[in-house]
Amino acid sequence: MHRATRTLPIALVATVLAACGSDSNGPTPGFECLGQALPTIAPPLVNVSGMVTANVLSPAPVPHAFVYAFRTGDTTHLAGDTTDTPGQYSVGIATGGTPVNGYLAISDSGHHIDTYAYPAVPLAANVTDNVLMVSSNEFSLLAASAGITPVAGGGFIGVVVRNCQGAPVAGATVTSSPAGTVRYNAGGLPSSTATSTAADGVAYIANVAPGNVTVRATASGHALREHVVNARADAITLTEIQP
């Protein structure tokens, strides 16, 4: 439910950000929207569609996964669908005329870890939201690669830092409140030594206390727009951070 098409977030994406010039007094390229007001109105119905895949090294469709849309703070789902054989889903969400602050909940009868996908900003237009799920075995391998020992009952948040155009941002640092163990990718895999995002913009916040978590990022000297997600115990929460 983000403003741009993307795959969230443990997908191994390598994107090189294009360099462009700007006036020395103007905003840093890619951060022109920093601080701009968010939309306050939305069409009566917005559609969220995409593909659910699994297997980090070779993503493949996940059929028969349950995808439900919720408004934050409300346990009644707004819309739902089941992925088809190619892993596609589509949910139409009634907005009431205002952007929807909510999330997607994705599950597939225990074959993969339950996953929750949050937008960087409230949903005010149709979007494509592709979600990559991981199995418990894959999660353990990824955690080991990052030098993390998962704590039972802890939350895990995967983040992609993007600029105003939706391109992943390299060199960003991510923090949260409450704090967790932060890691980044290097060479397309979680690293125990990387200190900022690679070209894929990916960061991980592990062993964070379950409940509401504020996620933040700094990139190119800019503090990006922070927002709150709910990190469920022993589940995966996915989100993006944008200016």
Located regions from the model:
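Bacterial N-terminal signal peptides that target proteins for export
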Residues: M1-P9
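C-terminal motif of bacterial Sec signal peptides marking the signal peptidase cleavage site
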Residues: V16-A19
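Structural motif
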Residues: A42-F66, V160-V169
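Hydrophobic beta-strand segments
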Residues: H64-T72, A172-S176
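Short, low-hydrophobicity acidic/polar segments
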Residues: G80, P86-T149
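Structured interaction patches on ligand/partner-binding surfaces of diverse proteins
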Residues: S107-V134, V208-N212, T218-P243
